[in-house]
Amino acid sequence: MTKKVAIILANEFEDIEYSSPKEALENAGFNTVVIGDTANSEVVGKHGEKVTVDVGIAEAKPEDYDALLIPGGFSPDHLRGDTEGRYGTFAKYFTKNDVPTFAICHGPQILIDTDDLKGRTLTAVLNVRKDLSNAGAHVVDESVVVDNNIVTSRVPDDLDDFNREIVKQLQ
């Protein structure tokens, strides 16, 4: 059975941090499913890429997925603004149950809402690192960091390393 990767996404995502990992995963034979506020709605990246949401967060069941991908840009901040905290709850399933969780740039912000970062080693874009540290994570400045089931990366320049690692984690 082909593995399915949930991608949580909102407006102002960093286009390349969505499209590049998605392409790497699909080229490796994995299915990707975009989860957002409402099924069949459209989200638009910072540079204009338009993506149709496959499954609304209200209908999304984390146990249906083999991994979670959280691209950066301003999308994670919008997702964290969900008044019901549904994206943090969705992500918590992955972190709590040791299911592969991939986050780049601002993406690790969502992981703060899982309350599962204490003692974890992560990386992220510079302006998110203090927040991760305050949530109990040990934060380092490396292109890719693997801590058990969580893979994090900093910026688009790290995408080759990030993509290689996330595919490896699912093989």
Swiss-Prot record:
<dbReference type="InterPro" id="IPR029062">
    <property type="entry name" value="Class_I_gatase-like"/>
</dbReference>
<dbReference type="Pfam" id="PF01965">
    <property type="entry name" value="DJ-1_PfpI"/>
</dbReference>
<dbReference type="InterPro" id="IPR002818">
    <property type="entry name" value="DJ-1/PfpI"/>
</dbReference>
<protein>
    <recommendedName>
        <fullName>Uncharacterized protein SAV1875</fullName>
    </recommendedName>
</protein>
<dbReference type="InterPro" id="IPR006286">
    <property type="entry name" value="C56_PfpI-like"/>
</dbReference>
<feature type="domain" description="PfpI endopeptidase">
    <location>
        <begin position="3"/>
        <end position="171"/>
    </location>
</feature>
<comment type="similarity">
    <text>Belongs to the peptidase C56 family.</text>
</comment>
